[in-house]
Amino acid sequence: MKKYFAAAALLMMMAACGSAGQDKKLEGTTWKLAKMEAIPAAAVGKEADFFTLEFNAADTMVAGRTNCNRFFGKYELKGKELELKNLGMTRMACPDMQYEDAFVKMLDEVDRFEIKGSELTFFDADKSLAVFKAVEK
């Protein structure tokens, strides 16, 4: 009986360890900006839903929020290549609009992505543009 209990406990621990290090999926995950050169960390972390984005596989739509406005558009995936298309957004005027402008410019420059664990990085060729963290729900 003790052998079975020990074996069951070992299997459960192995299963837990195996799932802990898995990469998040681009689609179906809420991503929050963690680091971008043009936006100070204080502006990024100001509100929980500032500088977030989500990719919806069902309709290949991307949607999110800057520090002021909401945005939406289409995306196309080819392996690790990513193209964001037809982005539109609400047009409220807010303080610190330069951060929103920099964020939207970055979205236009993205041509590929990489996910390691719960971290998403956008690239333009080999240049890292922004790093996002998966939001735990």
Where does each model-flagged region fall?
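Lipid interaction determinants
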Residues: 2-6, 17-137
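Short, linear, compositionally biased motifs with a strong N-terminal bias
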Residues: 10-11
